[in-house]
Amino acid sequence: GVYPPGTSVELSNGWRGTVAAITPGNLLQPKIAIKEDGKTKIVDLSTEKLFIKRSLDEQPREEVDFLKDAE
Protein backbone atom coordinates (compact mmCIF):
# COMPACT_ATOMS: atom_id res chain seq x y z
CA GLY A 1 0.00 0.00 0.00
CA VAL A 2 0.85 3.66 -0.02
CA TYR A 3 1.84 5.10 3.35
CA PRO A 4 1.68 8.87 3.83
CA PRO A 5 4.47 10.74 5.65
CA GLY A 6 4.09 10.42 9.41
CA THR A 7 2.78 6.84 9.28
CA SER A 8 4.44 4.48 11.78
CA VAL A 9 5.53 1.27 10.06
CA GLU A 10 7.35 -2.00 10.65
CA LEU A 11 9.89 -3.07 8.03
CA SER A 12 10.54 -6.60 6.78
CA ASN A 13 13.61 -6.90 9.03
CA GLY A 14 11.65 -5.93 12.16
CA TRP A 15 12.85 -2.32 12.37
CA ARG A 16 10.18 0.22 13.28
CA GLY A 17 10.12 3.76 12.02
CA THR A 18 8.12 6.58 10.49
CA VAL A 19 7.57 7.37 6.82
CA ALA A 20 9.69 10.49 6.34
CA ALA A 21 9.20 11.20 2.63
CA ILE A 22 7.62 9.79 -0.49
CA THR A 23 9.22 10.09 -3.91
CA PRO A 24 6.72 10.97 -6.66
CA GLY A 25 6.65 8.12 -9.15
CA ASN A 26 7.88 5.66 -6.51
CA LEU A 27 5.15 5.72 -3.86
CA LEU A 28 5.72 2.14 -2.70
CA GLN A 29 9.34 2.71 -1.62
CA PRO A 30 9.42 5.74 0.69
CA LYS A 31 12.22 6.97 2.93
CA ILE A 32 11.81 5.75 6.52
CA ALA A 33 13.18 7.49 9.62
CA ILE A 34 14.51 4.94 12.14
CA LYS A 35 15.57 6.00 15.63
CA GLU A 36 18.62 4.05 16.77
CA ASP A 37 20.89 4.81 19.73
CA GLY A 38 19.40 8.29 20.11
CA LYS A 39 20.07 9.17 16.47
CA THR A 40 17.75 9.22 13.48
CA LYS A 41 18.81 7.15 10.48
CA ILE A 42 17.05 7.51 7.11
CA VAL A 43 16.49 4.26 5.24
CA ASP A 44 15.63 4.65 1.54
CA LEU A 45 13.51 1.65 0.55
CA SER A 46 14.26 2.27 -3.13
CA THR A 47 17.92 1.37 -2.50
CA GLU A 48 17.59 -1.19 0.33
CA LYS A 49 16.35 -4.77 0.10
CA LEU A 50 13.60 -4.01 2.62
CA PHE A 51 9.87 -3.40 2.40
CA ILE A 52 7.07 -2.21 4.66
CA LYS A 53 5.61 -5.24 6.40
CA ARG A 54 2.73 -3.39 8.06
CA SER A 55 1.45 -0.10 9.39
CA LEU A 56 1.60 0.35 13.14
CA ASP A 57 -1.08 3.06 13.06
CA GLU A 58 -4.73 2.17 13.50
CA GLN A 59 -6.91 2.44 10.43
CA PRO A 60 -9.08 5.57 10.31
CA ARG A 61 -12.64 4.95 11.54
CA GLU A 62 -14.14 5.71 8.09
CA GLU A 63 -11.91 3.08 6.47
CA VAL A 64 -12.91 0.45 9.05
CA ASP A 65 -16.62 1.21 8.52
CA PHE A 66 -16.20 1.02 4.74
CA LEU A 67 -14.45 -2.35 5.00
CA LYS A 68 -17.16 -3.71 7.34
CA ASP A 69 -19.89 -2.67 4.87
CA ALA A 70 -18.07 -4.49 2.06
CA GLU A 71 -18.25 -7.88 3.82
Pin down the residues of each PLM region.
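Terminal helices and disordered tails flanking the catalytic cores of nucleotide-processing hydrolases
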Residues: G1-E71
